[in-house]
């Protein structure tokens, strides 16, 4: 990416206006680095949305803890829906993870992104296959909360959220903000740690490895979304 404007800090986040070169186009991006936690992430994405009069969508990149069995460190995870690990109003008839008055989970409203996502995954498949240690790409429910999922509570978390593949401390908060603003959202995370590793599994991979991998997928998706948007605009013009 190339600098569009100087970076600046607002609240709990640093904002980096950038251009992403896609063919002959320079795609405007606002890269945001928030601090850790649900409130910090929600504050950052709300601020970011306020800077754009035409936001195509939000992509959350970063690291995550692998939750589902069979996931390994280094795997790339694509969110299909998002909920909270530590929201519990079940005593009042709500589902585990559901905030009262809000949906059980957030689907990201990104159904229209499926073609762009498939193109992005296909474009990066040769990179994945030729890697010294190929990783898997998995899709499913992503969890987020203010508490870590560890060996002490991983069994309960897996039972409560059977389809969940990962947990972190930001994704669902971003999904909720995007839901409120009716902006498409998707989480793209790379597994740095395992919440409940098996005896023969590596359970940690350096952030210097996993963060760039997540970013690569996120930027490829952004490029595909821009290309798709330009083609749709051309069709409308015709």
What are these regions (language model features)?
Residues 1-50:
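N-terminal short beta-loop-beta anion/metal-coordinating cradle
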Residues 29-36, 139-144, 188:
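Active-site-proximal beta-strand elements of phosphoester/diester hydrolases
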Residues 47-52, 70-71, 175-184:
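Alpha-helix C-terminal capping segments
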Residues 56-59:
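Structural motif
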Residues 67-162:
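Mid-sequence, gly/pro-rich, charge-dense loop/helix-turn segments that line enzyme active sites
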Residues 145-200:
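A C-terminal functional module that forms or caps the active site or interfaces directly
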Residues 195-238:
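His/Asp/Glu-rich mid-to-C-terminal helical/loop segments that flank catalytic regions of hydrolases
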């Amino acid at each position: 990416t190339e600098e569009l404007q100087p970076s600046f800090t607002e609240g709990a986040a640093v904002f980096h206006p950038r251009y992403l070169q896609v063919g002959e186009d320079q795609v405007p991006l606002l890269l945001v680095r928030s601090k850790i936690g649900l409130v910090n992430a929600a504050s950052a994405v709300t601020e970011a949305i306020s800077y754009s009069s035409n936001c195509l969508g939000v992509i959350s990149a970063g690291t995550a803890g692998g939750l589902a069995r069979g996931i390994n460190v280094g795997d790339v995870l694509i969110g299909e829906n998002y909920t909270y690990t530590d929201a519990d109003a079940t005593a009042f008839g709500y589902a585990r993870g559901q905030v009262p008055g809000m949906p059980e989970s957030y689907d990201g409203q990104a159904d229209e992104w499926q073609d762009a996502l498939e193109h992005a995954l296909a474009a990066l498949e040769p990179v994945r296959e030729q890697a010294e240690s190929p990783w898997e790409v998995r899709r499913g429910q992503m969890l987020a909360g203010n508490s870590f999922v560890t060996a002490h509570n991983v069994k309960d978390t897996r039972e409560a959220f059977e389809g969940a593949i990962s947990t972190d401390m930001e994704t669902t908060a971003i999904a909720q903000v995007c839901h409120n603003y009716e902006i498409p959202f998707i989480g793209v995370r790379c597994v740095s740690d395992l919440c409940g590793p098996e005896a023969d599994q590596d359970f940690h991979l350096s952030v210097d490895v996993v963060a760039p991998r997540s970013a690569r997928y996120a930027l490829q998706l952004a490029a595909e979304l821009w290309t798709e948007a330009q083609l749709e605009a051309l069709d409308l013009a015709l």
